[in-house]
Structure formats: structure tokens, C-alpha cells
């Protein structure tokens, strides 16, 4: 923030006690009596926060009712049995018959995304996709786990999380035909949601490949330049980004005399040598590579 008086950048600070924004360079008061949107209490640990908090958690698409529900407590209840019965009744009426399918799918999604150690924003993206699919009736006649896996894989691509398709297929024993059928439904729904287009690029996979093959960073730099050039020229369309990145790393490592065999590269990434060879051929057929000594 720039001071309107002395025009100094990043010199404005907030005085919490007086509620004023002050310039540290010229001492001008930019604004006084500023409203503090934070809580009216202070907490120094988790216990303090739990005792003083008077509001619930923020809304989230990971829960069928977006988190807007009532929880009946029994900490100070005189009749514990009556309170317990009320809790059970409240839990039953909280989910309407039409929401049962959504509750089941979101429960599976939250469990599996935690097992895969995916970040919260990926879970929320997948939850929004699943909600839209339930609304449009695209969750019928399809295996629930296959649908969840497809939604999580697509959400990783939307949020620039480089996770390979093979990781999901091997973990859940899903056939290629089942997965692509589910992914087709996910893509159909995601196209109707603004901002839900895949943003990931082939170069995102290269750090993982370098780590698994124990290669120096310079190879990653050159391999990234190569796959970025292919991506800009439209040569990556319809090709697996992981295998394309792996082939570029294989080629650059060979040119820099830090050789890795195709088998070593393929085995470290759970892909076939044939895939590496095909992507390698795509690279050398489209580029004239000149090595300057």
C-alpha cells in the first residue's frame, strides 16, 4: 500500500490498539477508527480458541449442507439420555432422502482424498464437481469409487497438482475403459463450471522424475525448456504429460552424458518402455537437436 502523502511504498502499518493506519515514513494518519473484522477475544492456544469461539466452521462444499447445520451438545445437559436421543434424531432428519446419494459420495471423496494426501483446495474442487454431477443425474449406473477417482484426478489437473493417472488406476484396480468413461462424465460437468479447466503443464512432472532418478537440476531445466516448447507448438495434445516429460528427461540426460536406460526411467515411474520410446520418437521427429561443444 502506498502512502498518499509521501508516496512511499509499503510504509503503512496498522495500529491495533488505536485502530489507525499510519505511515511509518512521514507519520501521517491515513485512516482512524478502522473496523477490525477479527474476533473480539484473544486465544493463545487451541484450548482457549475452542472455549471462546462462538461461531462454527466456514462453509465448505465437502459437506452436503455446506456446513450450515446444528450440533446439539450435551456438556451441561441435566438429562444425558434425553439429549442423546435428540442428537440421534437430529442426525437422522439432517439428511433428506434426495441428499443421501450426495452424502455417500462426499464421504467417500473425503476419505480417499485424505488417503492420497491431497490438499484441501483439491478436495473442494472435486466436491463441487460431484455436487454438479448429482444435480444433473450423471452419477447413475457407474461405480462410485471410479467416479470419485476420476473427479480427484481431474481436480489435480485443475489445481496444478502433478499426479499421474497410473497412481490412481493401480491403487484402486480400475480398468482404463472404466476410468475414461467416468472421466468423460466429469469433464462434461466441469466444462459448465467457470475456471474448472485443466491448467497443468508437462513441465510440472519433471521435478518428480528428477527426484526418482536422482538427476541434477540442470537436466530438469533443459527438459522443461523442451517440453514447454512442445506445449506451445501444440505437440503435446493427446499425449500423456508424464511420459512426455520422462522422454525429455531421458533425451537430455543422454545428451549431457548422464545416461539412464529406458528401463530405469520406465520402472521408476510405473510406465512401459514402449511409452517412453514412442514419446522419445515424437520429440526427435519434430525437433532438430544440435549439441554445441
Curated annotation (Swiss-Prot):
Sequence repeats lie at residues 107-193, 204-285. The keyword Zinc applies. One of its GO terms (molecular function) is DNA-binding transcription factor activity. Stabilizes TBP binding to an archaeal box-A promoter. Also responsible for recruiting RNA polymerase II to the pre-initiation complex (DNA-TBP-TFIIB). It comes from the Archaea. Disulfide bonds: none annotated. GO terms for cellular component: transcription preinitiation complex. It comes from Saccharolobus solfataricus (strain ATCC 35092 / DSM 1617 / JCM 11322 / P2) (Sulfolobus solfataricus). This is Transcription initiation factor IIB 2. SUPFAM superfamilies: Cyclin-like (SSF47954), Zinc beta-ribbon (SSF57783). It holds the Pfam family TFIIB. A zinc finger (TFIIB-type) spans 1-31. GO terms for biological process: DNA-templated transcription initiation; transcription preinitiation complex assembly. Keywords: Metal-binding, Repeat, Transcription, Transcription regulation, Zinc, Zinc-finger.
